[in-house]
């Protein structure tokens, strides 16, 4: 049977990394990653994605503004779109709570420690110290199908980065920073902030980057229909 072990390994090895080394990533490498990712499928070739590459002084300015905005409103600004239903129902609530507990244990943050939890959120808005931050926007007049297309584009970026030895963390939290990003990036009103992404060389010595995340077995999410 034909196999593609390289692609399969990239998919299995990709993980969200929440801490990066102080090691630069060349703009040429970022361009190569995005140039490969643009071949993602999209409905009727609509290609709804738009990407902002944040580095250098701009990265420092934007992350500082984002952290300051979060400190001014630590309960969080309304995101451009809802992340989860409230309350989150089963089986998703169990999976969510299991992951958050595992991450909290790796970070050494008890759920009751609001100060440390907020400090961890601030790390999100510093792109987890990655040298490159990506911000993704989409025309808000588009409908739900475009989010499916966007997911394909984001996955392509993650895999293209992984194939070059880099790692990523996709962060929907950046959607809550749309006022800051609208100002800093001069975003038009018709562009909604979909997500951000940290891109760099992972610091795999960090406990949070050594987590083993369980996935459903094939039989749990697949139904084979023969007749």
UniProtKB/Swiss-Prot annotation:
pH sensitivity of activity: Optimum pH is 8.
UniProt GO BP: catabolic process
Keywords attached to this entry: Aromatic hydrocarbons catabolism, Flavoprotein, FMN, NADP, Nucleotide-binding, Oxidoreductase
Top-rank taxon, per record: Bacteria
CDD domains found in the cross-reference section: PnbA_NfnB-like
Catalytic activity from the UniProt record: N-phenylhydroxylamine + 2 NADP(+) + H2O = nitrobenzene + 2 NADPH + 2 H(+)
Covalent S-S links between cysteines: none
Residues involved in NADP(+) binding: 44, 109
Top-level enzyme category: oxidoreductase
Regulation: Inhibited by dicumarol, p-hydroxymercuribenzoate and salicyl hydroxamate.
Pfam families: Nitroreductase (PF00881)
Single GO term (MF): nitrobenzene nitroreductase activity
Thermal properties: Stable at 40 degrees Celsius and below, but it loses activity rapidly at temperatures above 45 degrees Celsius.
Co-factor(s): FMN
Functional pathway: Xenobiotic degradation; nitrobenzene degradation
Residues binding FMN, per UniProt: 14-18, 172-173, 215
Subunit and partners: Monomer.
Family affiliation: Belongs to the nitroreductase family.
Role summary: Involved in the biodegradation of nitroaromatic compounds. Catalyzes the two-electron reduction of nitrobenzene (NB) to produce a nitrosobenzene (NOB) intermediate, which is immediately reduced to hydroxylaminobenzene (HAB) by a second two-electron transfer. Also active on menadione and nitrofurazone. Replacing NADPH with NADH results in a 4-fold decrease in the reaction rate.
Official protein name in the record: Nitrobenzene nitroreductase
